[in-house]
Amino acid sequence: MSVLKKPDLTDPVLLEKLAQNMGHNYYGEPAWPNDLLYTFPVVILGTLACVVGLAVLDPAMVGEPANPFATPLEILPEWYLYPAFQILRVVPNKLLGILLQTAIPLGLMLVPFIENINKFQNPFRRPIAMAVFLFGTLVTLWMGVAATLPIDKFFTLGLF
């Protein structure tokens, strides 16, 4: 037989907390099973219904339709592959381009070992990791934009 501690309902501190609904959600129901089994599926299915409904009723054109009788001047990959495409396009040796793309994740795996700081610390107090992140983001965006331009405008992005 388990022994449960009964709350002292004459304690003024406890009565003040109960008056402010502390320890309970606003409508007084527990999160399990009510929220997790009933509310979340309704929200998820409602969101899914909205997305599917919009996709069926108002489809967005992703680009111009393909013409099997005309080859485009320059064939580009999908937008998320632009930086990798730009590396292969700029580096003269294709093997060197593949090795460069392999070296990027390997270099990122070394960053935590370079900076010997508590992993639970604020990310803004890790200057090396923040510098690597910001530099990598800028270079990736730069290469992604440059992949859509001619090769002679790669470094300046056509601005100068």
Swiss-Prot record:
GO BP terms: photosynthetic electron transport chain
Pfam family name, one: Cytochrom_B_C
CDD domains: cytochrome_b_C
GO cellular component: plasma membrane-derived thylakoid membrane
NCBIfam families named in the record: cytb6_f_IV
UniProt topology in membrane: Multi-pass membrane protein
Function: Component of the cytochrome b6-f complex, which mediates electron transfer between photosystem II (PSII) and photosystem I (PSI), cyclic electron flow around PSI, and state transitions.
UniProt similarity note: Belongs to the cytochrome b family. PetD subfamily.
Organism: Prochlorothrix hollandica
Annotated transmembrane regions: 36-56, 95-115, 127-147
UniProt protein name: Cytochrome b6-f complex subunit 4
Entry keywords, A to Z: Electron transport, Membrane, Photosynthesis, Thylakoid, Transmembrane, Transmembrane helix, Transport
Subcellular location: Cellular thylakoid membrane
HAMAP family: Cytb6_f_subIV
One GO MF term attached to the UniProt entry: electron transporter, transferring electrons within cytochrome b6/f complex of photosystem II activity
Encoding gene (name): petD
InterPro entries named in the record: Cyt_b/b6_C (IPR005798), Cyt_b/b6_C_sf (IPR036150), Cyt_b6/f_cplx_suIV (IPR005870), Cytochrome_b_C_euk/bac (IPR048260)
Broad class of where this protein is predominantly found: membrane
Complex formation: The 4 large subunits of the cytochrome b6-f complex are cytochrome b6, subunit IV (17 kDa polypeptide, PetD), cytochrome f and the Rieske protein, while the 4 small subunits are PetG, PetL, PetM and PetN. The complex functions as a dimer.
Disulphide-bridged cysteine pairs: none
